[in-house]
Structures are given as structure tokens and as C-alpha cells.
């Protein structure tokens, strides 16, 4: 019997960067290519470790892009405020930026792909962004801005989240991340 509380969070791992041209927003038919496990004495630390295990390592620049569908705008405010409190600069497309600004978030407006530079793609391709939060409106249409934003983010090594609950979980885990955490790659541990 274990007397200490232990939290374990299993997280799927997807290899979207290997699937050139594929939509990265998840549907019910999507299968993960692996999984990782974050184990810790509290939920937030286990969550952070699971994100690290899944390959999401932040921050580098503390700059992010948010472009969310209308039905996610209300929830996006809380997520944006969490990232803002963590020191992130938030760039957002016109309607998302306006909504965030109207609700107290210091979001910087950035042009859509089809508009003049600087635009969303300039930030992504210029390797000036750590994270993209883009919730799809229709998905799978390769001509739409959202698809191009998500695809280019993945192909240039920028982490891209497509749901507000995952974005909120990442912010929560980053709020509690610290240098005192012990990270162990179990693949390197002998005698397990």
C-alpha cells in the first residue's frame, strides 16, 4: 500500500509533423502514435510532466498566437489571462484580438494570412512564436486560414493546440512548473 498521494496522467502523442499536409485538429477517427506518462505527488506537476513527455516544452520566447472560433471566445479569455500572467505576449487575429481586448486582455492584433505583412504566417515562419492556439471552425479545408496556420505551425516546430481545454491544461501546468521538479526518462532507467 502506498501512503503517499501519487498522480499519474497519461497523454497521447501525435506525430503530425511527419504527416505533411494532414489536418492536425483531432476527430473521433484519430489515433495517437504513442503515449507518455507524467507521475508526481500533485496533479499540476504530473500534468506538466505529461506535456513535457508529449514533446511540448515551453517557453522560449513567451509569444503566442490565438485565433479561436466564436463559440470558444468566452473560454479563450480565461486561457489568455493565464498565459498573460505567465508573461506571454499574445497575438491574435482581428475578431479574437477585439474580443480579448474587450475583456481585459492585452492582445496584439495581427493580420490574417491573406492580409499585408506582418501577418500570422510571418510570425510563425519567422520562428518568433512558442505556441499557437487555433480552434478550427470547419477543418480539413486546405485553403482556409486556420488549416494553414495549424499546418505551418507544426511544420516549423511551433506547438499548436486546437482545443481550449488542452490550452487551459497547459497554462495550469506552466503555472506550477518549477526548477525543483525531478524529470526522469524511464527509457534510460535500468532494472524497471
What are these language model-derived features?
Residues 3-161, 167-172, 179-180, 184-192:
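ATP-dependent carboxylate/acyl-activation modules
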Amino acid at each position: 500500500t502506498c501512503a503517499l498521494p501519487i498522480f499519474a496522467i497519461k497523454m497521447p502523442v501525435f506525430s503530425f509533423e511527419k504527416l505533411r499536409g494532414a489536418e492536425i485538429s483531432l476527430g473521433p477517427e484519430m489515433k495517437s502514435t504513442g503515449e507518455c506518462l507524467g507521475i508526481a505527488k500533485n496533479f499540476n506537476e504530473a500534468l506538466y510532466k505529461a506535456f513535457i513527455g508529449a514533446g511540448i516544452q515551453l517557453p522560449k520566447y513567451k509569444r503566442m498566437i490565438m485565433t479561436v472560433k466564436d463559440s470558444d471566445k468566452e473560454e479563450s479569455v480565461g486561457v489568455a489571462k493565464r498565459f498573460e500572467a505567465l508573461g506571454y505576449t499574445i497575438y491574435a487575429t482581428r475578431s479574437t484580438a477585439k474580443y480579448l481586448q474587450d475583456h481585459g486582455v492585452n492582445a496584439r492584433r495581427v493580420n490574417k494570412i491573406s492580409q499585408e505583412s506582418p501577418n500570422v504566417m510571418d510570425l510563425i515562419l519567422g520562428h518568433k512564436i512558442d505556441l499557437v492556439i487555433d480552434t478550427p471552425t470547419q477543418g480539413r479545408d486546405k485553403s482556409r486560414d486556420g488549416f494553414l496556420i495549424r499546418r505551418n505551425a507544426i511544420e516549423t516546430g511551433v506547438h499548436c493546440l486546437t482545443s481550449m481545454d488542452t490550452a487551459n491544461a497547459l497554462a495550469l501546468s506552466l503555472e506550477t512548473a518549477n526548477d525543483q521538479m525531478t524529470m526522469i526518462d524511464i527509457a534510460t532507467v535500468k532494472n524497471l
